[in-house]
C-alpha cells in the first residue's frame, strides 16, 4: 500500500490545529520536558510563531498522509527557515509498515529538494516511538539532548571547594564560555561557524546582560588546594511555578581532567540548586559529547528529548 502527501485543506485547519496542539502538549508533558501550563504555553508559541497566517503561512507546510485507498493515515508539519527544514510534528493515526515509512521518507526528501534546503532537523521526544521509527535509518545524527534530574539528591561535594566567581575572574570566563559554546554549536552540525558565533553571543547577552549581577544567574569557580579546577554556571528558572535550576556551563580546567572533578562539579551544581529552592535540575548536552552523556546518566539524569539533524 503506497502513500502520498497532500496539502491540508483550509477547512480542516481548525480541527488539525486543535488535535495537534493537544498532541504537542502531551508530548512535552509525558516526556517531562515541560510540565503543566508550561507545556501548554510552549505548544501555543509554536502556532503563533510558525503559523502566523494559519494554513496559508508560506514558511510552513501541513500535509496529510494518505494511502492509495484515500484514507488519511496521519499528518506531518514542516517549517522552513534559512535553508533548513524543521519537522515540527509527525502524527500517525496508526502504525505504518516499514515500506510505507520508507515511501513517506522519499516524499520528504522530495520536499527538501523543492525547497532547496541543506539540512533537515527534528525534535524527538523519548516516548514518541512512531516518530523514531520514521526517522531511524536515514542518517540523522543526535545534535543535542535535553536531560532532567528530579528530585535532586544530596551528595558529597567535599572533593572540591566551590565559591562565587569573582569580578576579576569573570571577563576571562565570559570570553572562554562564549567561544566554547560557539565551537560546540558548530561541531554539533546544527549551525555554520559564523552562525554559531552569532547565536552564542546572542544567548550569552540574553542570559548575562548584567554579568555577575544578573538576577537568577549563579557563577562559581571550583578549586582544590587553592588551585582552580573548574567553573560552574547555573540559571535559576521556574518549572511549573517551582524553582528549577539549569546548568548553562560546567567545565573542568585543562590539565585537571580525569580526576573526578567533573562528577564533583555536578554534585556541587545539585547542592547550589537545592540552596536556591529548586527541586529539579536540567541541562543540555551535545550529542557528540558521549563522555558527558554517560556521566549524566550515571548520576540519574534522564533523557527528555533529542534534536536530530541531517545534511541533505
Predicted regions and their residues:
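Conserved GNAT acetyl-CoA-binding A-motif
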Residues: 112-125, 274-284
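Short hydrophobic clusters on alpha-helical segments that form packing/core surfaces
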Residues: 108-112, 247, 268-269, 273, ...
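Acetyl-CoA-dependent GNAT
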Residues: 11, 18-23, 28, 35-88, ...
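Conserved N-terminal entry element of GNAT/NAT acetyltransferase domains
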Residues: 1-35, 148-168
